A protein has these predicted regions:
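Phosphate-binding site of ATP-dependent enzymes
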Residues: 13-88, 92-95, 99, 103, ...
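Active-site/binding-pocket entry motifs
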Residues: 2-3, 66, 78, 175
Length: 184
């Protein structure tokens, strides 16, 4: 539950597999979550930049999965093929922008901003969603409050260059600190 990056995540089909998955999960954390699987899914990710109620969402992306779920190996070991470390999510194969109908993309971008505001986020976050292909329903899967690589590849595709992203993050940090200073 608390490690992120799909550490300890297992999809199971039988009770024996569930027992093994639980043993694996508790080897990483004393809290685990067992939930119904989405069998026909696409992962769609979106980044949000801002502070509090002022925010904007990037274009959406669809990372490529080697299996039914986007695993730790997919994210950080190049699909497990090379066995070596990679540059994390930034080096993962992906489709930017995600191949989605405009309405679905806008729904995910709006939901991303709503989640950003609901948790009182500041700076840049990346929110990972699961899209049930059979029902067209979107599920928020993970909120990355300090996304690896700052999700710069999503902002670059949204027209914000890396240096401009860093400048905006610094501006947000200074503004937040000024607001805190004014409270005392």
């Amino acid at each position: 539950v608390n490690l992120g990056s799909s550490v300890g995540i297992t999809k199971v089909n039988t009770e024996n597999e569930l027992d093994d998955a639980i043993r694996l999960g508790i080897s990483f954390s004393d809290t685990i979550l067992v939930e119904k699987a989405i069998c026909n899914l696409r992962e769609i990710n979106c980044s949000v930049l801002g502070d509090g109620d002022e925010c904007e969402a990037s274009v959406c992306e669809e990372p490529f999965m080697n299996d039914e779920i986007l695993s730790y190996e997919d994210k950080y070991l190049g699909g497990g093929k090379s066995g070596g470390a990679s540059k994390g999510m930034a080096s993962l194969g992906r489709k930017i922008p995600a191949d989605l109908p405009k309405e679905k993309s806008e729904e995910i971008r709006k939901l991303s901003c709503d989640i950003f505001k609901a948790i009182g986020a500041s700076g840049v976050v990346r929110i990972d969603f699961l899209l049930d292909v059979d029902t067209d329903k979107v599920y928020a899967n993970e909120i990355n409050t300090i996304p690896g690589s700052l999700a710069f590849y999503l902002w670059d595709a949204s027209g914000i260059k890396y240096t401009d992203l860093i400048d905006r993050l610094v501006e947000i940090a200074f503004r937040r600190q000024r607001n805190r200073d004014n409270l005392t």
